């Protein structure tokens, strides 16, 4: 029997995602819930994009993109929290600040990812969002995208 492309190139796409014009998804990718890809975004095969992510137009996704962030530039980099999307989905200001603090440690403390994960786990109160971010980083197969000022 013949197989369609969907059978050959498995893709998992979550609920309530918005893909603007000319967004392209390679095979074997995973995209979380409430993800927005602006126009002309290309997602490399085997990449994972977490929940509540916004990726700016014209971006090339080569690495995994952790939950709750905005990503842009070339190479694709962390540019902040998707605070507008999170507010629209009912996240409190306190919860958004907690998520921002996690990413400040990850991207601004000059720690490698393993050190940052250990620091966040030891110093920050457990929450579903904290645990989701840490699990995402631990499970990343391609590595997570860098911060804007980090070396690739």
Task: Label the model's feature ranges.
Residues 1-9:
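Single conserved hydrophobic/aromatic residue that forms the stacking wall/gate
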Residues 9, 27, 45, 90, ...:
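Short coil/turn residues that cap or connect secondary-structure elements
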Residues 68, 74-152:
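Terminal amphipathic alpha-helical/low-complexity segments used for targeting or macromolecular assembly
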Residues 7, 13, 19-21, 25, ...:
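Hydrophobic face of beta-strands forming the core of extended beta-sheets/solenoids
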């Amino acid at each position: 029997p013949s197989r369609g492309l969907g059978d050959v190139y498995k893709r998992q796409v979550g609920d309530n995602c918005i893909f603007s014009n000319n967004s392209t998804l390679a095979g074997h990718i995973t995209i979380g819930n409430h993800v927005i890809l602006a126009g002309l975004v290309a997602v490399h095969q085997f990449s994972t994009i977490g929940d509540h992510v916004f990726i700016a137009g014209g971006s090339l996704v080569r690495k995994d993109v952790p939950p709750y962030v905005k990503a842009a530039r070339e190479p694709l980099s962390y540019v902040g929290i998707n605070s507008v999307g999170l507010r629209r989905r009912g996240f409190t200001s306190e919860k958004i600040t907690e998520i921002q603090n996690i990413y400040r440690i990850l991207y601004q403390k000059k720690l490698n990812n393993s050190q940052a994960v250990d620091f966040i786990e030891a110093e920050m109160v457990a929450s579903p969002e904290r645990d989701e971010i840490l699990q995402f980083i631990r499970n990343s197969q391609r590595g997570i995208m860098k911060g804007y000022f980090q070396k690739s």
